[in-house]
Amino acid sequence: MLSLDQIHLLLNTPEDCYIIFGIDNITLDIIGVNNDDNRRNEEDLTDLLHKLFISTNNQIKISIQTETIDNKEIDILIIHDTDKVPVFLTKDYKPKKDTALPKGLIYAINGSINTPKDSSAPFELINELFQKFNHTDLNIKEQYFHVLKDYKNWFFIENEDGRFFIYNPNPDFYIKLNDDDANRFKTMSYSLNQYQTNIDWQLVQLRYRHLTIDECMAMYLDQGNCLVPSPEVESFKIDYQETIYYHCLYKNTLKYQLLKVFSSIPGLEKYPLTRFKNSIVIYDTKLELKKTHNLINSKFSSKDIVNQLEVTEKDFDFYYKKARHKNPDYSIQENQVNLTELNLVRLLKTQIIHTSLN
């Protein structure tokens, strides 16, 4: 059986932890859980954990992976890594046939030694857990990613020194926006659906005190009504001869977190942001991209895909005139490429839903 002190030990660690059910603890023989009356599914265990008097019980994430060996099923309980540490009891726990666990004590694994049930982990180990909670155990670039995830605590300021996003809990973290004068495209596929199609490019500097930790490009869309990071470019192969490029963002990346920070500026219109998101693909992971590409290539022939990406004369004329109004250098070739990309984006977005269900 899984005990409460074991849960504490496994939560107060630096990585995912695993408990295997269906293997004898002493002989290591595979006995299986096929007929085990104590077997629990993921939903049952999650519900049980949320009822315990644990400081972060609602933050605990688990999953169960079942494997079959010699026709015997074993369950692998994965307790996923969390930064909501140290974990401790909020109320005394007194099991009928085991040692009582006092509230407030912190159990952890120190090397190969478990914290005794009537004691707390040593100071050095508790300090490491608090460093994990505050992300100070990470390098500065990884720390930056975590403060960006706290996007509601950033605020925008513009003064004679420039334009900045500042992190309220720790102003040593701040973002500086700089006008970019390089000769770049003035119109992109994801700006065509804006009321104003021209782009104002920005150099984004992620700074910590006087140091620049990272840089990337961003742009104001719709005459400054929306600020977004420059999306990534990916390729889709129709066949061995033809490849089409399109723009996307990946969740759980620095650029996606920047998008959330930029979107939190008070007073900005929400519609330009919606139009931008509709013009790119937002993936959970690279694996989702691969699944989506494979699904399209399995469902449609190359000819069918080409037909779905074909730009209508009506769309071509409309967007060409619209873009040329603000950008006289906008060419017929650019327009064809951009509109083909938008058609590909629409196709990809319809298939992402299917991959998430498989």
Report the location of each language-model feature.
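Intrinsically disordered, low-complexity regulatory tails
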Residues: 56-147
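Bergerat-fold GHKL/Histidine-kinase-like ATPase
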Residues: 1-31, 35-46, 51-52, 58, ...
